[in-house]
Structures are given as structure tokens and as C-alpha cells.
Amino acid sequence: MTRFVNRFVISDHHLGHTNSWEKFKLSDGSPLRPFTSTEEMNETMIERHNAKVKEQDTVYFLGDVVINKKYLELVKRMNGRKILIRGNHDIFKDEDYREVGFEQIHGVRVFVDKFILSHIPLHPDCVTERFRVNVHGHLHANEVMRTRTNMVHGYMTGLVTEPDPQYLCVCVEQTDFTPLHFDEVEERIQQRWKDTGYTGPVKAWGNGSGPN
């Protein structure tokens, strides 16, 4: 019998990243992370994770979990069956991640939901009809953008630059430092498709669940 579980996704915790609230800035100079200490940042993300994720749930971490190896121990305090898709800062040995609770470690993970999970956004040629949405990290507060021709009543009225509907960034800065349930992922994708006039369907498991 197939067992179904709730699934969540999140990226770029940077647990233990010293002074990251000072180093990471928005374009207007305001802080990207609203914390005043590394400990506050770590504890806030762990608390929000555990408030949403239960032990039997599955969580996909899309890379850059920690910068300093010693902070990997914090992962032990986070609920759920943990799966890592490596990012550019996940440079330690597989066994180091397994020791703190990651059951699987991947480069890119592909789902029947037609999501591709990755750390760095993939080249558009990889996000084809077969895999229509790249759920990714790495960009923090930014998004993959596209420029298209705007048409009104058959006439070109100019160019529009907007978030690319085939990409969704799930970095902590864009998820309120909380994992997103797969239902929430689909809702965000559908809203973006509505906003941009994109019509490709997303197939998802009922209630954000899927085969374990």
C-alpha cells in the first residue's frame, strides 16, 4: 500500500551565517533578514519550521543549509524526514549531512508533479513541456525574470518585464522563513500564471501529498 505524506520545500537557510542580516541587503539598502543576531535568526527559522512540519512529514531543503560545518547540528532539531538538494555552499561530505538527519542527498530532484527542484535556477531549455516549473533557491529576494511583447487587441504596445512563470523561488526570504507546503507552492504558481497570462497546467497530488 502506498503511504502518503505531507511535503514541504524551503531553501537557503544559511544557518549560522554570521552577520548575514547586515551582509544581505535589498536594493534600497534595507536588511534582507530582519534579525539582530545569528542566534535569533537560527532560532526563528527552527521554531517556524517545527510549528508547521511534523515528524512524519517530508521536507526538501534546496541547498545552502549552513555555511559553517559546526552549525549542521542545528538540523537535528528540525522536524520531518529531511531530503537535501545540494547548493553551492553545501560542500561537506554526504556522511556529514546524513549524521544530522538528511535521509537523501541529490543534485536535482524531479517530480511527477512536473516540478524540478534545484538550488540554482536551471537553464530554460531544461524547463520544457515535460517539466514545466523549476522550484529553486539561490536568489534570496530576487526572481528569474522574463521580457515579453505585450499585445492588446492584436497590437504590440511595448515590452513587459515580469517574473518568469516557469520558475518559483522558495528562499527563506520569500517564504517568511517558513517551509512551504506543496499546496502553497501550487497556489503561488497558479497565481503567477494568472498574473502573467500563462496557461500551462500544474498536476499536483491531492492535499499536497505524494508517494513517500
Feature annotation, model-predicted:
Residues 1-62, 66-212:
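Extended recognition/assembly regions associated with phosphoester-bond processing machinery
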